[in-house]
Amino acid sequence: MTEVFSQLFDLPSYVINAGLSAIFLGVVSGIIGSFIVLRKMALMGDALSHAVLPGVALSYMFGINMLFGASLFGIFAAVLIQYISKKSNIKSDTAIGIILSSFFALGIILISQARSGIDLNHVLFGNILAVPNSELEQSFWVLVAVIIIVSLFYKELLISSFDPVVSKAYGLNTDFYHYLLMLMLSVVTVSSLSQVGIVLVIAMLVIPAATSYLWTNKLIHMILLASIIGASMGLIGTYISFQNNLPTSSAIVLLGSLVFLISFFASPKNNFFRKEKVS
C-alpha cells in the first residue's frame, strides 16, 4: 500500500507511512476522545496514557505483545482509581493523580533497569516519521476494532455518557461500559506511542473532540467531526513538520490547538464575535 502512495505522490515511503499513521490515529482519537470529553474524563485519559508505561516496559522485557501487556496495566489503573474513589473519601481527581504518578514512576524505573532496546524519549514523545509497516498495520486494525465496538454498543455508550443514573434505571451495567471504554482508551494509547508518545497522546484524544463539541450537540456528529479534525491535524501537522524540520508530534498538537482556539471564538455555542458586536 505504501509503495503505491509513494510512487503516486513522489514522496519517500516513510513519509507515506507517517501520513497514513496520522490519519488512523486522528480518526480513532476522535472517536474515543468524544466519549472522554462527554464524560468529563480528560484527566482519566491522561492518567491511563501514563499508567500503561510499566506495561510497555514489561512487554519488552518478557517478549510479549505490547498491546496486551500495556492494556492490562491501563485497565488495572482504571480499576484502582475507581476502587480508591468509592472506598474512601478521596475524590477521583486525587486518586487519578496518585495512580498517574505512581505508575509513571514505576514505568521509568523498569525502563531504566531493563537491559533492552527501549528508547525512553521515543516512548515519551514518539516519532511518527519512523513508524514501520508493522505498527502502521497495527494502528489500522486498532481503528477497525474501535469502530466495530463503538458501532455495536453505541446506544449503551451514548446513554451512559449523558446520564449514568438513568442508565442504571434502565438496567444498563454502567461499570461494564466504563471499563470497555477504558480498555479501548488503553489500546489506542499504546498504539499511538510510536506516533506522538505518552506525553502528547492526551492532546490527540481531547483537542479534536473538544473542538467538535463546540460546533454540534449530537454525539454522532461530534464523533464524525472530531475524526475529521483529528485526521486533518495529523496529516497537515506531519506535512508541516516534514517540510520545516520540526518535531512532528508537537507540530500536530499545536496545529490542533490553533484550530480549537479559532473554533472557541467562532463557534455558534460561544458566539463571541456576535456578543462583542451587540455589546
Per-range role (PLM):
Residues V4-S13, V27-L38, G55-N65, L158-V166, ...:
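Short juxtamembrane and helix-loop transition motifs at transmembrane-helix boundaries
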Residues A51-M61, I98-L110, A130-V131, T174-L185, ...:
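Small-residue-rich segments of transmembrane alpha-helices in multi-pass membrane proteins
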Residues V201-S250:
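Transmembrane alpha-helical segments in multi-pass inner-membrane proteins
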Residues L246-V253, S257-S279:
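Cytosolic-side transmembrane-helix boundaries in multi-pass membrane proteins
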